[in-house]
Amino acid sequence: MPILTSYFGFLLAASTITPALFIGLNKIRLI
């Protein structure tokens, strides 16, 4: 099922990009 695979790929990307953006915003705020 390509749709299911792309869905899990999207969740994996979101779960890795979101914390990275959050940490980046915190670093910018600290500077």
Swiss-Prot record:
The 4 large subunits of the cytochrome b6-f complex are cytochrome b6, subunit IV (17 kDa polypeptide, PetD), cytochrome f and the Rieske protein, while the 4 small subunits are PetG, PetL, PetM and PetN. The complex functions as a dimer. Coiled coil: none annotated. The keyword Ubl conjugation does not apply. Belongs to the PetL family. The chain crosses the membrane at residues 4-26. It is found in: Plastid, Chloroplast thylakoid membrane. The keyword Cytoplasm does not apply. Its main location: plastid. Keywords: Chloroplast, Electron transport, Membrane, Photosynthesis, Plastid, Thylakoid, Transmembrane, Transmembrane helix, Transport. One of its GO terms (molecular function) is electron transporter, transferring electrons within cytochrome b6/f complex of photosystem II activity. Pfam families: PetL. One of its GO terms (cellular component) is cytochrome b6f complex. It is a single-pass membrane protein. Component of the cytochrome b6-f complex, which mediates electron transfer between photosystem II (PSII) and photosystem I (PSI), cyclic electron flow around PSI, and state transitions. PetL is important for photoautotrophic growth as well as for electron transfer efficiency and stability of the cytochrome b6-f complex. GO terms for biological process: photosynthesis. This is Cytochrome b6-f complex subunit 6. HAMAP family: Cytb6_f_PetL. It comes from the Eukaryota. InterPro entries: Cyt_b6/f_cplx_su6 (IPR007802).
